[in-house]
Amino acid sequence: MSLLQKCWQFLVNHFEDNHSLIHFELTATQWKALVREHLTPIIEKELQVKQIADFVWASEYNSLGMRKVISFFYLNNAYATFKWGWNFEFIPKCSGSKVVWARTDKSIYTHVYELSKDFYNSDGTNRKKREAYDRTIVSRYFVIEKNAKNVIKKIVKDHKKTLKYLLPTIQEYYRSTETMELILRRIDLNLENPYYCFINPGLLISKVFILYYLKSKEKAISDFEKISFQCEDIKNQYYKKLLSMEEYSPKR
């Protein structure tokens, strides 16, 4: 029995036709199931990825050592939007006090990513911008004033509507960043955006590793020396990983 069927039966059993359900909230487990049942098939088909974890979808690595990653970007534990970007086989991530590779489904990390401009450029005092922001959000929390038996269908419809709204932007992003050179240009644009600098402080590190990958080694090392790290040990670990790229080649 699907999530929709289970919740539908619960509502049929607990609410009379004339009862007004004001608030309805899916549990975290139910939300995961709803997304897996109703959004994953669309995401996998439209973006050529597979679900690899709850709220995370990714492709296989391509010949350049890149893989698409789409995931939830949480506002809190009940509201989220989507983020989309790339994971790179040759770029590590910082995990606690260690700099490690992010090459498996379990350790996957989105090195460079974007969100809808309608989401981060919202202005609560501007009605049109607020409406655009609302179109980018999904939630496991729902308010309905009548016809409680249809609440799950309404949540599913709302999720699909948000995904449909964002899909063209996501698809255009991947078309516009399909090479390392195009990704570098995109990183430079994001570095001019205070919002992206705030939510993704690793952009400069990603840029350095891509430069090194493209054989611009002197510039990569020069730019690396300008990056501020939380401590010297982390910097040294990143530098060691950077130099190890001399021996890197995509495993395909």
Language model features by range: what are they?
Residues 28-52:
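Amphipathic alpha-helical segments
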